[in-house]
Amino acid sequence: RWIKRFHNHFIDHEKLNVYMIGYRVGEDTAPDAVNDVICAYKEIVDDAVAKNLSVDDIVVSGASAGGHLALMVGLSNEYNFKSSCNTLIKPKAVINLFGITEIEKNSQFLDEEKFFSFSNYIKTWLPESLTLEEASEKFSPINLVGPNSPQVLTIHGTKDDWVPYDQAILLDQKLKDKHQLLTIENGGHYGFSDEADQIIRQNIAEFLRDTYKD
């Protein structure tokens, strides 16, 4: 099934083979979501091979927590994940909509803003056995950037109250020429204007065309 907000941003989705991934969320569940999506990605690769679909041009995408997880899948070569879920077939590109790129800095932002009690969802996500510093070191995408990192398109609003725009800047500085950053002026966390949605659609379509023409 297509989640409506993704359907809205992908113009040529009828031409794509689309897989949706679910993952565990909630209090004290870290890092289950990361492991879930990496294992799900391998299942997708295996299914694509079985159905004789191309595995050379896979693009992973997600928004918010899903953006963070899409980046983790794309950068999983550098993630010490010792299990049968490892695969040599990596995504060709990642589309990241306002996902976390540096966990500790995002947590600090939430503590400083604190627009309501318990607004720091990152600390809620972490079990007692995993410190903020450890989680940030291992599960922050910017710490996993390497020479084989895929091309990434990031879409982020400058007025995001949950994942600050600075997170996109950090990734841009780390990925350099492997990164395209689409800044949505005054954009928040979801709920972009119709004009911004149109710009997002156009940029995603261009990014996909550039990705697939190679």
Over which residues does each language-model region extend?
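Acidic catalytic loop of the alpha/beta-hydrolase fold
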Residues: 103, 159-163, 190-191
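Conserved serine/cysteine hydrolase catalytic core
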Residues: 140-149, 166
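Mobile cap/lid helix-loop segments that gate and shape the active-site cleft of serine hydrolases
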Residues: 105-144
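Short beta-strand/loop motif that positions the catalytic acidic residue
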Residues: 148, 153-156, 160
